[in-house]
Structures are given as structure tokens and as C-alpha cells.
Design a protein with these regions (language model features):
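Alpha-helical substrate-recognition element adjacent to the catalytic core
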Residues: 2-102
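C-terminal cap/substrate-recognition subdomain and adjoining C-terminal extension
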Residues: 68, 79-147
Length: 147
């Protein structure tokens, strides 16, 4: 209830981690060397462009935002400054959502206290899910998201 406006259903909101949920870091020796050079030179757009997208989670993200109208936020624990590059990467995939950078998963856990209780966050590993609690769901790179 907000401002005496009673709704039949609570707005659903989702969040997901960029790394491990929406994309995989560069693999292979040559790609890793190029990625390391891009990081050293702070060329974040080039670095994020080297990441391999996970098709099913990206389709789930696009569907959630564009068809269902569900608000989604993307979180990253990569180095500061990559938010704009991730935002552009997502825009090229067909979705515009807010991207937030955190130093580590513990900061995300602290931030979750201020979000809606119905919010779900999709993470890459079981350890991250255990840390974030009941709101977290481990997302497979080969399957759709489940609310």
C-alpha cells in the first residue's frame, strides 16, 4: 500500500548479475590477453564487447522488460567504470535497464534490505544465492529465468 492506494497485486521486480548470468568472460588465451590489455587501458566498451552472451537469460531479460513490463536491474561486481559499457552492451541486445556497480556481493546483500520484499535476484552460483538469501535464484546460462 502506498499513499492509500490499495493494489490487488504487488509489483514484481527482478535483478540479475551481469557476470555469470547474462554473459561469460573472455575464454581462451588470446582473448584473455586482449581482455587484460583492454582492462589496463581502461577501454571498458572493448572489454565488455569480448564477453560471450548467454542466449536464454538474455531472452528472459528482454521478455521481462519489453513484454511483461517487469522492472529489472542489472548488477555487476566488475571494476568501477564498466556500467556504461554494460548499458550499451545491453542496448545492442535490445533492452534498456539500469546498471549498478558494486564492489562485491556483500554490498549487494546490504542494498537488498531497501528493495521490495517481492524482488528476485538471479545469480550465477549457489554460494551467491546462499549469501543473498531467499530472494536469490541460481540462473542457468542454458535456461530461462523462473520467478
Amino acid at each position: 500500500m502506498e499513499r492509500n492506494d490499495i493494489q490487488a497485486n504487488a509489483p514484481i521486480k527482478q535483478a540479475c548479475l551481469f557476470e555469470g548470468v547474462l554473459a561469460a568472460p573472455p575464454a581462451g588465451n588470446i582473448k584473455k590477453m586482449r581482455a587484460a590489455k583492454a582492462i589496463r587501458q581502461h577501454e571498458w566498451h572493448r572489454y565488455i564487447g569480448m564477453w560471450t552472451p548467454y542466449e536464454m537469460p538474455l531472452k528472459s531479460l528482454v521478455d521481462s522488460v519489453n513484454r511483461r513490463g517487469i522492472g529489472v536491474e542489472v548488477y555487476t561486481c566488475l571494476t568501477s567504470g564498466v556500467e556504461d559499457a554494460i548499458d550499451r552492451w545491453l542496448a545492442r541486445k535490445g533492452v534498456a535497464v539500469p546498471v549498478y556497480q558494486f564492489e562485491n556481493i556483500y554490498e549487494i546483500h546490504a542494498e537488498m534490505k531497501f528493495h521490495s520484499p517481492s524482488m528476485r535476484i538471479h545469480v550465477a552460483t549457489e554460494e551467491q544465492a546462499q549469501l543473498l538469501g531467499l530472494r536469490a535464484r541460481v540462473a542457468s546460462p542454458h535456461k530461462e529465468w523462473v520467478l
